[in-house]
């Protein structure tokens, strides 16, 4: 018979988060749940992410804060690039009108992520308060969008949070087949070039696992997080040369 989880802490504005070790365990109704309440502002989100905590809740719920154990993480060196997708990236790089942009349409990206249908989900966790809060994070340089553009149209992309060299993937969308995967591959090339070691994926999904992500213990994740936080962050600009982190120089030739 499973034991009852401990009472869930309710946070007042600007109150410190509980230790992540106090998050509900795998035997609870909501493994990884740490606290509720608080405020969604830049400083609270910065403190949360720097401790391995993130918000995730649905419309009508209070703000819920999570720190799962284990944690889904994509080690940048382990990104799985299948030959067929490598060919698609090469074609993308060589096709006029196809390009990667960073931070040119953050609000469009997060709105598209919020409105994208998800298998097994009837709504979205990217509720209006979340969109507004992450928009503020973007304005202060702590949230970024990686965008796939085709002939001047936004075809897909993703957004993430970045503190130093600690990167946290949030959500992605596609309007054209594989456009979000191309944006993720661009982020991987960017991260490899700048020495970013891991991308936090938060929750386990088969899609992320197929790309090379895997679960690690919370303690191991927090060690990697601390290492990333200790380093100065890169300039969030994309250079076509970053593709060479995924493709050989010969692959880039025309």
From Swiss-Prot:
GO terms for cellular component: cytoplasm
SUPFAM superfamilies named in the record: Acyl-CoA N-acyltransferases (Nat)
Reaction equations catalysed: N-terminal L-lysyl-[protein] + L-leucyl-tRNA(Leu) = N-terminal L-leucyl-L-lysyl-[protein] + tRNA(Leu) + H(+); N-terminal L-arginyl-[protein] + L-leucyl-tRNA(Leu) = N-terminal L-leucyl-L-arginyl-[protein] + tRNA(Leu) + H(+); L-phenylalanyl-tRNA(Phe) + an N-terminal L-alpha-aminoacyl-[protein] = an N-terminal L-phenylalanyl-L-alpha-aminoacyl-[protein] + tRNA(Phe)
Composition skew (Pro residues), residue ranges: 1-10
One Gene Ontology term from the biological process aspect of the record: protein catabolic process
Protein name: Leucyl/phenylalanyl-tRNA--protein transferase
Protein family according to the UniProt entry: Belongs to the L/F-transferase family.
Top-tier EC class: transferase
Job of this protein: Functions in the N-end rule pathway of protein degradation where it conjugates Leu, Phe and, less efficiently, Met from aminoacyl-tRNAs to the N-termini of proteins containing an N-terminal arginine or lysine.
Pfam families: Leu_Phe_trans (PF03588)
Lineage, top ranks: Bacteria, Pseudomonadati, Pseudomonadota, Betaproteobacteria, Burkholderiales
Name of encoding gene: aat
InterPro entries: Acyl_CoA_acyltransferase, Leu/Phe-tRNA_Trfase, Leu/Phe-tRNA_Trfase_C, Leu/Phe-tRNA_Trfase_N
Native species: Albidiferax ferrireducens (strain ATCC BAA-621 / DSM 15236 / T118) (Rhodoferax ferrireducens)
GO molecular function: leucyl-tRNA--protein transferase activity
Main location: cytoplasm
Location in or out of the cell: Cytoplasm
């Amino acid at each position: 018979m499973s034991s009852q989880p401990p009472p869930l802490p309710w946070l007042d504005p600007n109150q410190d988060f509980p230790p992540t070790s106090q998050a509900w365990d795998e035997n609870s109704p909501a493994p990884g749940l740490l606290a509720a309440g608080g405020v969604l502002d830049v400083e609270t989100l910065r403190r949360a992410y720097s401790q391995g905590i993130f918000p995730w809740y649905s419309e009508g719920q209070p703000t819920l804060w999570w720190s799962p154990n284990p944690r889904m993480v994509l080690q940048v060196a382990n990104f799985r690039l299948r030959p067929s997708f490598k060919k698609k990236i090469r074609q993308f790089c060589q096709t006029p009108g196809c390009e990667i942009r960073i931070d040119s349409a953050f609000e469009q990206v997060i709105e598209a992520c919020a409105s994208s249908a998800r298998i097994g989900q009837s709504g979205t966790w990217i509720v209006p308060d979340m969109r507004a809060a992450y928009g503020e994070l973007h304005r202060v340089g702590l949230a970024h969008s990686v965008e796939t553009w085709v002939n001047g149209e936004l075809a897909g992309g993703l957004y993430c949070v970045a503190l130093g060299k600690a990167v946290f993937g949030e959500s992605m969308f596609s309007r054209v087949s594989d456009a979000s995967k191309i944006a993720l591959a661009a982020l991987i090339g960017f991260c490899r070039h700048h020495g970013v070691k891991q991308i936090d994926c938060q929750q386990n999904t088969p899609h992320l696992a197929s790309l090379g992500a895997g679960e690690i213990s919370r303690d191991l994740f927090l060690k990697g997080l601390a290492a990333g936080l200790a380093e100065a962050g890169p300039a969030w600009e994309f250079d076509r040369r970053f593709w060479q982190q995924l493709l050989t120089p010969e692959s880039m030739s025309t």
